[in-house]
Amino acid sequence: MSPDTAADAAADPALQSSVLTVSLGERSYPIHIGPGLLGRAGALIAPLLRKPRVFVVTDATVAALHLDPLLASLGAAGIAHDHVVLPAGEATKSFSQLEELLDLLLAARFERSTTLLALGGGVIGDLVGFAAAILLRGVDFIQIPTTLLAQVDSSVGGKTGINTAYGKNLVGAFHQPRLVLADTTVLDTLPRRELLAGYGEVVKYGVIDDPAFFDWLEEHGSALIAGDGGARIHAVLTACRAKARVVAEDEREGGRRALLNLGHTFGHALEAETGFGPTLLHGEAVALGMVMALDLSVRLGLCPPADAARLRAHLDHVGLPTDPRRLEGAPAWNAERLLAAMDHDKKVEDGKVTFVLARGIGRSLLWREADTASVLATLRAAVAP
C-alpha cells in the first residue's frame, strides 16, 4: 500500500496494534485497532485535545464494563473528565434523548475547547456524534466503539444521527471524529447475539468488493465469533481499511460510498416494522437485507443464483438470521408495508429507490432501475406466511 493511499497502516508488533488514517486533508484522523487500547486511551487521546478536558457519554451496559478503566486512563494522562450514563438500547437514538443530552451539556457549561467522547456501540456513537455536530455549532468528538458493529462500521466515516417515526438515521449530519479507538479486547464482553450482529456488517465488506475477504470469512468466521483475537483484529482492520478508503474518496455519499449501504434498504424497512426494538438488531437486519438484495439481484438477472445461495449458506452457518419469519417475536410481516417504508430511504431520488445490488460476491453496484413488481416479489418471498 503506497503512502498516499486513503488508509495507510502502520503495525506495532510489540502491542499487536495497527493504525489506519482516514485521509480527509485537515480533517484526517487515525483509527487505532488492537487489544488493550482502552488502558492506553488517555495517552493516545491527549495529543489531540484542544485542552485536557473531555466529557464521556456512555450507556448503562457499557458503563458497568468499561467506564472505570477509561476514566482511570484519562486521569493518568492528566485529562480532566466528566461523564453521563444514558439508557442502553436503540430507543436512545431519539429526539428526546438528544435534547436531554444537549441540555445536560449546556447546563454543565460545556465549552468548545472540551471534547466529547463516545464510549459505546453504534447508538451512542451516532447520538454523541450528532450532538457534537450541532452543539455550539460544532465541537470535537472521539469514538471509542465497544461493539463489533461499531468498530467495523458506524464509528468510522462521520455519519451521525438519530431515528424518527419515519425511519432510521433520517435526521443527522456528517461530522468526522478526531480519533477512533477500537480496542478488540472489549469484544470479549459482548453477548453472542451482539457479536453476531456485528459480524453481519463484517460480511458486507466481502460481498461489496472483496471476494478474497469473503473467502477468508468462510474459513475463519466461526473462529472470529468464538473468540479468536487474531481473527478479530484482522476482520476489524480489513473492514476499517476498506471503509477509510471509500470515505476518503466520497465523504458525503455522492457515489461510491453508497455501496456501503448494501443490505440497508431492505434492512431498515424491517427495523422500522419492528419499531427499532430488541426483536431485530441492526446487524441482523443488514444480514437479512443482504440476502434480500441478492435475491432481487437474481430476479433482475444480475447475479448467479449460486452466489446468493453462498451468502445465505455462510450467514446460516455462523448463526445469523436469513429468514425474517423465523425471528423470535417477529411481527406479522406485510410486504406492502415494507415497500412503503422503503420510500423513506435516504437513497430515494426523484421518487425512486437506489438499491445496492450485486453481480456476485465481491461485485456490488448501484441500481436505480428495479421495477416495483420485482421488489415486491422479493419482499413477498422473504416475509409471506
From Swiss-Prot:
Cofactor annotation: Co(2+); Zn(2+); NAD(+)
Catalytic activity: 7-phospho-2-dehydro-3-deoxy-D-arabino-heptonate = 3-dehydroquinate + phosphate
NAD in keyword set: yes
UniProt binding sites for NAD(+): 122-126, 146-147, 159, 168
GO BP term, example: chorismate biosynthetic process
Pathway where it operates: Metabolic intermediate biosynthesis; chorismate biosynthesis; chorismate from D-erythrose 4-phosphate and phosphoenolpyruvate: step 2/7
Record keywords, A-Z: Amino-acid biosynthesis, Aromatic amino acid biosynthesis, Cobalt, Cytoplasm, Lyase, Metal-binding, NAD, Nucleotide-binding, Zinc
Cofactor note: Binds 1 divalent metal cation per subunit. Can use either Co(2+) or Zn(2+).
Subcellular location: Cytoplasm
Family: Belongs to the sugar phosphate cyclases superfamily. Dehydroquinate synthase family.
Protein name, as recorded: 3-dehydroquinate synthase
